[in-house]
């Protein structure tokens, strides 16, 4: 359940919710890091749930030694009231036997909070694309029926491509198609739940490979900004996203020179 950091429970009615899927390369989580850090979003609450692997650490967005010791947990909510934006950062994998419970928790919170729309940032294995997905941009989107009428035209104007369905029996028959997001974690199931429960959701994902996924995170967050205009885009160049201090340890500490 959601627990507020303050005495009063914040109102999210009419807000846009952005959350990542724990997927290949952790691209969605890295993109959310950039968003929280750049907008300097304060934490307004966290989730107390047994669906995620427990974790605790220092404040990943600390700007000084004073707030560096602030405790961070596996799922925290940040907010920007002027932009009517809420961000849920998930820092731990979902326990395999609790995936369905986690999806129910998310759907229930989305409905009770009155979010205007939810945006799920995700990724999928690039090596498992089919022929039609090899051409053009690696970015894809999906819209739930309740959001499709409002946003489809806008996405087409941006030149975005909808996630293609692929054949259930490739090379044999194309009559039966399915949505396939390899490496996408909870993406497909949560999107399907939102379609069934009439929850407005957009999924924005990128095909990538495991490794240094920082460029993928920048590509994904720039794509999101083109749609939502969270930060003003300069006439020349791209938006200057602020990398959080925690990224210094993204690949661990350096090689000790004494080894040589």
Swiss-Prot record:
Coiled coil: none annotated. Chaperone protein which promotes assembly of the 20S proteasome as part of a heterodimer with psmg1. It comes from the Eukaryota. Degraded by the proteasome upon completion of 20S proteasome maturation. The gene is psmg2. This is Proteasome assembly chaperone 2. Forms a heterodimer with psmg1. The keyword Chaperone applies.
